[in-house]
From Swiss-Prot:
Subunit details: Monomer.
Disulfide bonds: none
Main location: cytoplasm
Gene behind the chain: panE
UniProt: substrate binding residues: 98, 180, 184, 194, 241, 244
Binding site residues for NADP(+): 7-12, 31, 98, 122, 256
Lineage, uppermost ranks: Bacteria, Pseudomonadati, Pseudomonadota, Gammaproteobacteria, Enterobacterales
Documented effect of changing residue 98 to A: Increases KM for ketopantoate 140-fold. Strongly decreases catalytic activity
GO molecular function, one term: NADP binding
EC number annotated for this UniProt entry: 1.1.1.169
Protein name: 2-dehydropantoate 2-reductase
Length: 303
């Protein structure tokens, strides 16, 4: 397949490496146009992939079979809209990011839209990307009209396993959102690795109760206990990890809070549900962000 990967951060480089190794034709797409992008990845087994790949070639984009978007949630909408007119109208766009809410911003996109969520963990260490842990990627249609692209899951399964297709991806996205609503803000506020959250079961349960109430009103069956158990599993499995939001806060970058607890707040408001704990966490992270964004440009840069 011919694939353009939009966003060449940790997750983007992980996919570029895996696609290259399987013989797919790939290019990266960078915010600041460059003729190539450097991919420098250390795999979980310690092997190194170090290549310069084509980047920002509009002719390549115009003949791509897939646009894989691995940007931060707040970067997605502007970036995808800027490329949509060059991309064939039949080429699916697969979004893989934390949080929810980008689909609502892309309702007018004509290409098939797919949503994904992944438990693969990768982080930047200087100029190198470390593939910290293998995981599973769930993908499915973002909107009712987006159809069956399960063949993509089969192809991507051979590239970076495991990949699973869901006709109802929204339920999976909500489960992942519950995890993100707990782990990301709490670790960002307390400046701690994921495992430290084990010591705060009441706080976790409080957040899960609020998230479960919203998920039920969204039409997906769940319970606070189920969500809590799932969150605790993820905390145990990723105990040593530094969450993406804490990494952003430490690097004085814009976080994805608007698409995590912020998205939950918007859906809660639509259903008339009070979510005081999620509101408190959202406001605390926004306050942290504003402290350094005021000192910098005052505004997050566009993608």
């Amino acid at each position: 397949m011919k694939i353009t990967v939009l966003g060449c951060g940790a997750l983007g480089q992980l996919w570029l490496t895996a696609l290259c190794k399987q013989g797919h034709e790939v290019q990266g797409w960078l915010r600041v146009p460059q003729p190539y992008c450097s991919v420098n990845l250390v795999e979980t087994d310690g092997s190194i992939f170090n290549e310069s790949l084509t980047a920002n070639d509009p002719d390549f984009l115009a003949t791509s079979d897939l646009l894989l978007v691995t940007l931060k949630a707040w970067q997605v909408s502007d970036a995808v809209k800027s490329l949509a007119s060059t991309l064939p109208v039949t080429t699916p766009i697969l979004l893989i990011h934390n949080g929810m809410g980008t689909i609502e911003e892309l309702q007018n996109i004509q290409q098939p839209l797919l949503m994904g969520t992944t438990t693969h963990a990768a982080r930047r260490d200087g100029n190198v990307i470390i593939h910290v842990a293998n995981g599973i990627t769930h993908i499915g249609p973002a909107r009712q009209q987006d159809g069956d692209y399960s063949y993509l899951a089969d192809i991507l399964q051979t590239v970076l396993p495991d990949v699973a297709w869901h006709n109802n991806i929204r339920a999976e996205l909500w489960r992942k959102l519950a995890v993100n609503c707990v782990i990301n803000p709490l670790t960002a506020i307390w400046n701690c690795p994921n495992g430290e959250l084990r010591h705060h079961p009441q706080e976790i349960m409080q957040i899960c109760e609020e998230v479960a109430a919203v998920i039920e009103r969204e039409g997906h069956h769940t319970s606070a206990e189920d969500l809590r158990d799932y969150v605790m599993q993820v905390i145990d499995a990723t105990a040593e990890n530094i969450s993406s939001m804490l990494q952003d806060i430490r690097a004085l970058r814009h976080t994805e809070i608007d698409y995590i607890n912020g998205f939950l707040l918007r859906r809660a408001r639509a259903h008339g549900i009070a979510v005081p704990e999620n509101t408190r966490l959202f406001e605390m992270v926004k306050r942290k962000e504003s402290e350094y964004e005021r000192i910098g440009t005052g505004l997050p840069r566009p993608w």
